[in-house]
Every structure is written in structure tokens, then in C-alpha cells.
From Swiss-Prot:
Component of the dark-operative protochlorophyllide reductase (DPOR) that uses Mg-ATP and reduced ferredoxin to reduce ring D of protochlorophyllide (Pchlide) to form chlorophyllide a (Chlide). This reaction is light-independent. The L component serves as a unique electron donor to the NB-component of the complex, and binds Mg-ATP. It holds the Pfam family Fer4_NifH. GO terms for molecular function: 4 iron, 4 sulfur cluster binding; ATP binding; metal ion binding; oxidoreductase activity, acting on iron-sulfur proteins as donors; oxidoreductase activity, acting on the CH-CH group of donors, iron-sulfur protein as acceptor. CDD domains: Bchl-like. It is an enzyme of class 1 (oxidoreductase). Homodimer. Protochlorophyllide reductase is composed of three subunits; ChlL, ChlN and ChlB. It comes from Synechococcus sp. (strain CC9902). This is Light-independent protochlorophyllide reductase iron-sulfur ATP-binding protein. Keywords: 4Fe-4S, ATP-binding, Chlorophyll biosynthesis, Iron, Iron-sulfur, Magnesium, Metal-binding, Nucleotide-binding, Oxidoreductase, Photosynthesis. The keyword Signal does not apply. The keyword Protein transport does not apply. ATP binds at G39, I40, G41, K42, S43, T44, K68, N209, R210. Pathway: Porphyrin-containing compound metabolism; chlorophyll biosynthesis (light-independent).
Length: 296
């Protein structure tokens, strides 16, 4: 006798991480989850976008959701302790913690938190993200925040690391103009489609990064219903800002390329504040992407 396995709907099965209703982030805050292929520049993009929102006068909180805990170091100019490390120090008695123990103020007042994660091969990163949001709410740290940015590791869209999508209004996908990045982006679109059935998250658009051109991204956008919200070329000043452990907004204004990058981040931030029209994008099958991308 054969057994037919059916794909569970979102929220069914042990691999899914469900949001406690009490952990919902207050209405009014703009919550953005940033995803993309590993190494594509999500942390750089997230930190510079956080800085841009702060330049527009917004109160910003950035939450790094990667065990590497390197999301916010260009904002804080240091590698800050993670929530999971700090909780371990007090034997997970969160009531013993003060906000200053796990929230660090970075460039232009941006608040920074690194959730961290369990050791490799153990635990669930989504659980850690959930505990981070819980801790922030217990200390009423989300009530006076205008913008929350979740910077999520790699392109992992399992139940755990899809957890930030349960809190977000919009997902922004960082991609380059190449096959691997766009292939990963398609998987993220699939995750958004699944989460959007039960949560408020919607696709906000694409951020083209480290790419002189966007012809392949444009092809994918046209087929799926996505749009490019910002385009950052491979500017060496961005690489140097990481080495200097600072945001692009702290780099020399005399460089026209730096000015252009700053203006593009400010434009992106303002567009996100102006109530971006959510996208109803439709993902492609793997074979369709293979046939779509490339040159004739």
C-alpha cells in the first residue's frame, strides 16, 4: 500500500513557528523584513536603510536575526552581545534584564538588537527571534518605535527563519542581477505567498544590489509582478564603509558616488513611508526561471 503525502498549509506541522497573539507588534509601526541570498548584502542594506529612516526623523529599531550577529555593527561600530547570550547569563530569567542589557544605540539614534541563535545544528532560529520580540514587548520598547527592520539570515525560508514574516508589514528582497540571487528570490516569494494567507505581510519590492545592470531582474519582475524599489551599483565606498565599521552616511560627502548612494537610500526610505502598494507577485517554477534568465 502506498501513502500519499500532502503539503500542509501554513501553520500546520511541527516545523511551523506560530506567533503568540500577545507578541504582535503595535499598529502604527512600519515593520520590514529584509531577505535575500546569503552574502548578497542584506545587513549592509538594512543598516543603511535604518540610517536613512533615522535621517528622516523616524525612531528606528533594527533586529539582526542571524547567529553570526553581524547585522548592526556598522551602526554601533562594534559587535554587540546577542539576546540569547544575555539570556543565558541570567539562566533565561528575562525579568532580571534591563533594556540597556540587550538594546544598543547606534548611528543617529538607531536602536540595535542582535537576536543571535542556537549553536549550529541545534534549536530553532525562529524561536530565538520570537523570544527577542517578546523581550522587547515586555520592556515596552516597541511602543515608541516608528520603523522596525528585521535583517534575516540568508535565503532560509523554513518555519523558523520565516518567523519575522509573521510580524512584518512588508518584505524587501535584496538581489543581484545574476541567476543564483534571482533563484533564491523566487523561493522567498513562495514563502511570502504562504505567509500572506494568515498574516499581514506583503511583498514591498526588490532592492537591486552590487549590480551595474538590472536586465535579468527586470525579466523576473515582469514575469512575477515584482518591482525594483532601489538600485545600488557596485560602489567601492560601500565596501569600504563595512571595513570602517560605519554606515554609508558616515562616508565622505565629497564623493559623488557616495552622494548618489545616500540619496537612493533616502528615496527608498521615503517611498516605504509613503504607503507602498503591496504586490501580489506569483512565483515561478524552477524550470521556468532556468528558461527565463540568461542570454539568447
Amino acid at each position: 500500500m502506498t501513502t500519499t503525502l500532502s503539503r500542509p498549509t501554513d501553520g500546520e506541522g511541527s516545523v511551523q513557528v506560530q506567533q503568540d497573539p500577545s507578541m504582535k507588534i503595535e499598529e502604527g509601526a512600519l515593520v520590514i523584513a529584509v531577505y535575500g541570498k546569503g552574502g548578497i548584502g542584506k545587513s549592509t542594506t538594512s543598516s543603511n536603510l535604518s540610517a536613512a529612516f533615522s535621517k528622516l526623523g523616524k525612531r528606528v529599531l533594527q533586529i539582526g536575526c542571524d547567529p553570526k550577529h553581524d547585522s548592526t555593527f556598522t551602526l554601533t561600530h562594534s559587535m554587540v552581545p546577542t539576546v540569547i547570550d544575555i539570556l543565558e547569563e541570567v539562566d533565561f530569567h528575562s525579568e532580571e534584564l534591563r533594556p540597556d542589557d540587550f538594546v544598543f544605540t547606534g548611528y543617529n539614534g538607531v536602536k540595535c538588537v542582535e537576536s543571535g541563535g542556537p549553536p549550529a545544528g541545534t534549536g530553532c532560529g525562529g524561536y530565538v527571534t520570537g523570544q527577542t520580540v517578546k523581550l522587547l514587548k515586555e520592556h515596552h520598547l516597541l511602543e515608541d518605535t516608528d520603523v522596525v527592520i528585521f535583517d534575516v539570515l540568508g535565503d532560509v525560508v523554513c518555519g523558523g527563519f520565516a518567523a519575522p514574516l509573521q510580524h512584518a508589514n512588508y518584505c524587501l528582497i535584496v538581489t543581484a542581477n545574476d541567476f543564483d540571487s534571482i533563484f533564491a528570490m523566487n523561493r522567498i516569494v513562495q514563502a511570502i505567498q504562504a505567509k500572506a494567507k494568515n498574516y499581514k505581510v506583503r511583498l514591498g519590492g526588490v532592492i537591486a544590489n552590487r549590480s551595474a545592470d538590472t536586465d535579468q531582474i527586470d525579466k523576473f519582475n515582469e514575469r512575477t509582478g515584482l518591482r525594483t524599489m532601489a538600485h545600488f551599483k557596485d560602489v567601492d565606498a560601500i565596501r569600504r564603509s563595512r571595513l570602517k565599521k560605519c554606515t554609508i552616511f558616515e562616508m565622505d560627502d565629497d564623493d559623488d558616488a557616495v552622494k548618489a548612494v545616500k540619496n537612493e537610500y533616502l528615496r527608498l526610505a521615503q517611498n516605504m513611508l509613503d504607503n507602498v502598494e503591496p504586490l501580489e507577485a506569483v512565483s515561478l517554477k524552477d524550470r521556468e526561471i532556468f528558461d527565463l534568465l540568461g542570454f539568447d
